């Protein structure tokens, strides 16, 4: 199965995805028809926080919460502050164990209100070294530091592995500063 948000794609792209999924016997599902599913001991919840008719395709990101053994992981995709605001209005969000920081740590995501509500223990930022957008944004990093989130950035930490069975033990293939930013 592949879960997508249909409105995030042009009709030509949707047609191509449909043909490919049929060819390879993969079920293609719109996220608005799924909302959640279980896989073994894990449950996946898709939040309806899409911004209708937005010109910013990032606002069509699928935001997913994974729950496993009393741990909560929130995957933000490239969601914007507008998506975060909608999440805060529509849902009673819990505190999060692990946050995959939205939009590579861009200033268009990770609002103060959102970060203070979910209080992630660990924040993961995926951004390339010396990237042209100078990500992650320093204000986003300071916001996360302000709530004492342990920050791991792929620029310094490389591949990060978190053991969900072992009280969130973190291992990384560090390129530099192993403690995060």
Task: Describe each model-derived feature in a short phrase.
Residues 1-181:
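Non-globular, low-confidence helical/coil segments that flank catalytic cores
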